[in-house]
A protein has these predicted regions:
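Nuclease and nuclease-like effector domains acting on nucleic acids or nucleotide cofactors
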Residues: 2-5, 10-83, 92-176
Length: 176
């Protein structure tokens, strides 16, 4: 039997839930915030160097959750090494560290992978800490569609290159 590539592509579009996606399922991962982080206290919380290390959950927690969520998402590729258990609203922007609604298995092998999201996380984090972007605006950008936000915040991405800027007021190299 001859296979039709168009039919295969259509099947992929229709069955969507079987393969890893660049954006999380909004019903499973809508995002959740850390109520202890507000616009009024960013200079004492997220903008303090190393702050994310103080709230990051232990690896045993995120590794266990990643395996569970890979099954819940119905990904065809079930190898945990091919995913980063990532916070939709980054810790560096006051995302909730342990709420499963803020974590999802983000594919590593994609044009819009965890590395690209990290670039946006850093740029918006720096924008918030330098007063160029409001905290709620930055959080919404991730919760709504981080890929569209990546395209929209080009100027910040140029100004605050991940890994090439001295982080100054806060954060840490893992910034997420």
């Amino acid at each position: 039997m001859k296979k039709n590539p168009l039919v295969a592509a259509m099947l992929l579009l229709v069955t969507g839930g079987c393969f890893a996606a660049d954006l999380p399922d909004p019903t499973r991962t809508p995002g959740a915030i850390n109520p202890g982080v507000t616009q009024a206290n960013v200079s004492a919380t997220i903008c303090v160097k190393g702050w994310t290390r103080t709230v990051r959950p232990p690896m045993y927690y995120t590794n266990r959750l990643k395996k569970l969520q890979i099954r819940q998402y119905g990904y065809a590729d079930t190898n945990p090494r091919n995913y980063e258990e990532d916070h939709l609203i980054p810790l560096s922007l006051g995302g909730n560290p342990t709420d499963p609604r803020n974590l999802w298995p983000e594919p590593r092998r994609s044009a819009w992978n965890a590395d690209r999201k990290d670039e946006l996380e850093f740029a918006l984090y720096m924008g918030v800490c330098h007063g160029e972007v409001g905290l709620d605006e930055a959080r919404r950008a991730f919760a709504m569609n981080w890929i569209e936000a990546y395209k929209r915040y080009g100027a910040l991405l140029q100004r605050y290159r991940y890994g090439s800027v001295t982080e100054g007021r806060g954060g840490d190299s893992s910034n997420e």
